[in-house]
Amino acid sequence: MTLVDVRTPDPKRFIPGATGDWEVIVGMEVHAQVLSNSKLFSGASTEFGKPQNSNVSLVDAAMPGMLPVINEECVKQAVRTGLGLKAEINKRSVFDRKNYFYPDLPQGYQISQYKDPIVGEGRIVISLGPDRQGQFEDIEIGIERLHLEQDAGKSMHDQHATMSYVDLNRSGVALMEIVSKPDMRSSDEAKAYMTKLRSIVRYLGTCDGNMDEGSMRADVNVSVRRPGEPFGTRCEIKNVNSIRFIGQAIEYEARRQIGILEDGGEIEQETRLFDPNKGETRSMRSKEDAHDYRYFPDPDLLPLEFDDAFIKTLEADLPELPDDKKERFVRELGLSVYDASVLVSEKAIADYFEAVAAGRDGKTAANWVINDLLGALNRTGKDIEQTPVSPAQLGAIIDLIKAGTISGKIAKDLFEIVLTEGGDPAEIVELRGMKQVTDTGAIEKAVDEIIAANPEQVEKVKAKPTMAAWFVGQVMKATGGKANPQAVQALVKAKLGIEE
């Protein structure tokens, strides 16, 4: 891969050192497990969490005479992902053997793709912000390639005092290795890139993106240089399995390399591991080059070839992706860029919002989903799939406000009841006497009582009409928040002689 610098040095991303400014250069190789029922070259299940060595075929265990057979669904998923990345789809690709020895690699080689990957160059647009002026910065990150390969098994060194165990459940599972160009210039950009990539594959249904289960793992390449100078020597941080850790690993590694260079040392090209407990990287091994793996075409697999019709069929079935959905939310529903960005960040959130917004005001639905629902889920440590409030329930609360049955304040209380206890919002309002008081006579009586009991406040209102809000608050308090706020405000102003 020829490295090309497409970014103009940006002072706000420079890292100050003892001898001047530095710039960090980041590229990523993301391993995304393909969503499929069976493995890349065998019929064994890919189900997560099964007992050790229960999802293993003779092919996965490298029994003599067992030949690989390509899984067509994995090929389709790779092409779908390539299309979602706005990438070039290569109609001819080749599987190669990547030779190295490890106990959890029973074949003694990994079937991967080297010179002829299934997907070529593409791009992802990330968005940073908002800044203090509420503006977002869009940055295009290049994709170098996407190729298919087998995952290895898992070595377990903590099961026995003198022996290591090997679990081959993961061996042979299809991976998409998505290689970015070295276009990122900060840890924030790298985190935004990983977040966006995970969102895209989840929308496409090609990877579940569950980093805690190992479905997405990142090898992060980090180097530093003086602004405007050629790329420096990079170090690869292997298998970083959370977005937060990606940011921490980059920041530590950049500082480590800057320290070495400022002390007159040189950076050694090597592979490192990130220790999340210490928040630092440590050396693992010297970095291998391609020739160390002795790549050659796998003689058991023919080149993978398909035509334009195959690609067009898959393209026709692609779902609406995050950027397109965000643009539609802004254009059709009048949402702010920020609100639309939050709502499309996860497919499950976007689906929930669209169910709530159907037939209702989009801005109102967005406010409830972002501020109330997501806020409550964040407080309780749950995600959108675990929400106790269904779209129908939240929609019903919004409908009750619009109908004038409840006020906005009562709606907040109703939401908390539905969140903790469940139930039909309309029935809860009826059974608990939460209906808004719209009887003008009853409201007028409450207003008269508050005014009569507070002559000093009445005098203050004459000097400062905005003090009328105090009376509105007192009436709402006296009625338990059930009085119609608009009716209260109108009566208070009329009684106090305040002109509209």
From Swiss-Prot:
It comes from the Bacteria. InterPro entries: Asn/Gln-tRNA_amidoTrfase_suB/E, Asn/Gln-tRNA_Trfase_suB/E_cat, Asn/Gln_amidotransferase, Asn/Gln_tRNA_amidoTrase-B-like, GatB, GatB_C_1, GatB_Yqey_C_2, Gln-tRNA_amidoTrfase_suB_CS. One of its GO terms (molecular function) is glutaminyl-tRNA synthase (glutamine-hydrolyzing) activity. It catalyses: L-glutamyl-tRNA(Gln) + L-glutamine + ATP + H2O = L-glutaminyl-tRNA(Gln) + L-glutamate + ADP + phosphate + H(+); L-aspartyl-tRNA(Asn) + L-glutamine + ATP + H2O = L-asparaginyl-tRNA(Asn) + L-glutamate + ADP + phosphate + 2 H(+). It is an enzyme of class 6 (ligase). GO terms for biological process: glutaminyl-tRNAGln biosynthesis via transamidation; translation. Its EC number is 6.3.5.-. Keywords: ATP-binding, Ligase, Nucleotide-binding, Protein biosynthesis. The keyword Mitochondrion does not apply. Heterotrimer of A, B and C subunits. Allows the formation of correctly charged Asn-tRNA(Asn) or Gln-tRNA(Gln) through the transamidation of misacylated Asp-tRNA(Asn) or Glu-tRNA(Gln) in organisms which lack either or both of asparaginyl-tRNA or glutaminyl-tRNA synthetases. The reaction takes place in the presence of glutamine and ATP through an activated phospho-Asp-tRNA(Asn) or phospho-Glu-tRNA(Gln). Belongs to the GatB/GatE family. GatB subfamily. This is Aspartyl/glutamyl-tRNA(Asn/Gln) amidotransferase subunit B.
